[in-house]
């Protein structure tokens, strides 16, 4: 989940940065180069923060996380939300993902992989050396009467009453107010 959030943040940053810097000349004048001595491999870092083009007031708020919803998510993902911070992180990730709904993608072609145009030859499906039943069953971790035994399905987790839902909502409100204050202070300095 955290890696998904990082990928989304990087994608939004690249959208913001790419939209403002149309050419390499503009890119060089608005940023400083860092890293490689090769001009084509330079990494450009903006000289000042670039405000988000997404209007945060239009972003859909994440749902209220009730005990029933948290239990349902834990059962589906087989991940226990150990404390309030874990639920708050999930709430922030959902809010961040909701920003993607506001991005206008009209006229943008979908991403295609390079492998779509490369032929993938397959070998003929001719059986080689036949394996014995005992050799096949050696791959199983558990066998009963010469049959593979599959692992049990998702075992439901017990409900946990440790989470303080009011604290989660308060922390989310504090986080949003911090971001609003920070955004207002950045606007005042400009």
Curated annotation (Swiss-Prot):
Segment annotated as transit peptide: 1-96
Single GO MF annotation: ATP binding
EC number(s) on file: 6.3.5.-
Catalytic activity: L-glutamyl-tRNA(Gln) + L-glutamine + ATP + H2O = L-glutaminyl-tRNA(Gln) + L-glutamate + ADP + phosphate + H(+)
Subunit structure comment from the entry: Subunit of the heterotrimeric GatCAB amidotransferase (AdT) complex, composed of A, B and C subunits.
Keyword Nucleotide-binding: yes
Source organism per UniProt: Loa loa
PANTHER family: GLUTAMYL-TRNA(GLN) AMIDOTRANSFERASE SUBUNIT C, MITOCHONDRIAL
Residue span of region Disordered: 28-57
Matches recorded under InterPro entries: Asp/Glu-ADT_sf_sub_c, GatC
Keyword ATP-binding listed: yes
Keyword annotations from UniProtKB, A to Z: ATP-binding, Ligase, Mitochondrion, Nucleotide-binding, Protein biosynthesis, Transit peptide
The protein's name: Glutamyl-tRNA(Gln) amidotransferase subunit C, mitochondrial
GO CC terms, sorted: glutamyl-tRNA(Gln) amidotransferase complex; mitochondrion
């Amino acid at each position: 989940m955290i890696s998904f959030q990082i990928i989304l943040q990087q994608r939004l940053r690249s959208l913001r940065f790419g939209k403002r810097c149309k050419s390499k000349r503009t890119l060089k004048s608005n940023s400083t180069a860092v890293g490689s001595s090769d001009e084509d491999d330079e990494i450009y870092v903006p000289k000042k923060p670039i405000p988000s083009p997404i209007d945060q007031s239009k972003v859909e708020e994440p749902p209220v996380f009730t005990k029933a919803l948290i239990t349902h998510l834990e059962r589906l993902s087989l991940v226990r939300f150990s404390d309030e911070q874990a639920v708050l992180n999930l709430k922030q990730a959902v809010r961040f993902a909701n920003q993607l709904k506001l991005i206008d993608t009209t006229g943008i072609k979908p991403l295609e992989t390079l492998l779509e145009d490369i032929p993938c030859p397959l070998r003929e499906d001719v059986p080689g050396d036949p394996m014995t039943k005992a050799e096949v069953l050696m791959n199983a971790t558990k066998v009963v009467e010469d049959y593979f035994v599959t692992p049990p399905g998702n075992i439901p987790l017990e409900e946990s009453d440790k989470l303080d839902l009011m604290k989660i909502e308060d922390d989310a409100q504090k986080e949003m107010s911090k971001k609003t204050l920070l955004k207002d202070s950045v606007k005042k300095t400009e």
